[in-house]
Amino acid sequence: AEWREKGLIEVVNSRTKQVLQMNVEVLEDIEKNKNNSLSIKKAVKNLNKPLLIIHGTEDLTVPIVEGEQIYNWSNKEFTEFERIPACGHTFDIVHPFKKSNKKFDLVIKKTRDFLDRKFL
């Protein structure tokens, strides 16, 4: 009720402590699609295009098992799953961005290599 009345809800990011605002449209979208029409599983199973999943093995925000589950649902002919060891959700990049690091550089390299192989 409060979300609707205010038109937004504030959620604290547990990692950064940043206060994030979600407009009531997010709630309306969730309600409108509660029948699973916005199913990640269904979308991934129906995707017949190249898909690259890059996941930090120490991700506390989205555990690696969720990335593995997406990979398991995917068409293996088109999908690659890259695990970045000892790395969290942001690949050890902080906000605001100041500089890169070896782990993030590896993510960029793997992404570029994937795009070059699949689209050039």
Question: What is the role of each PLM region?
Answer:
Residues 49, 63-73:
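Short alpha-helix in the alpha/beta-hydrolase fold that links the catalytic acid
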